[in-house]
Amino acid sequence: KLGETYQIKICQTYTNKSNLDAVNFFWKLMKINESPESFLIRDKDYNIISCSPETLLEKKKNIIVTKPIAGTLNRTKKMTSKFAKDFFQKNEKESKEHNMIVDMERNDLSRICKTGTVKINKLKTVEKYRDLYHYVTKIRGSLKKNISNHDIISAMMPGGSVIGCPKISTLNLLNSREKINRNIYTGSFGYINANGDMRF
């Protein structure tokens, strides 16, 4: 129905049989697509490889931070960060989509953070990678008392940058239109320390 979603990230599934060694494949991928949140999980029955640059959530004590990415520009050798920032700011589509994701992530944080503590630290900054520029905003908040790690994960996952917004109605639309469950794809990987700090 009209108005059920403002932005939707529909995905397709591609499969291919291969005898490639997972470790070699991972390192080859890193050479052409360096990302700070990359990982390789090896198991007896499967391997999982990811090269995402995004920090969905980071919790230290009672402070939680999210850094949504919404906006990507191929980088050339002569291109500068200033050029990339000007491009994102002047591109109406990129700017509006970024604003929508930021608003949604602020809303997610407000469910688990103290009133008035959800703040934007860095709005619409440009992060430089080997072949890309990303449009990134950093948002932080102070957690309410008695908020569990389960509460945090439930509020923040999945991230808005991989589904669209608003979250619930867009997820329902994706579930009805995508033929195969995403499973691990566009999921989150991270850790929870013994003291409760976490990063995904």
Where in this protein do the model-derived segments appear?
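Extended alpha-helical targeting/anchoring segments
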Residues: 1-200
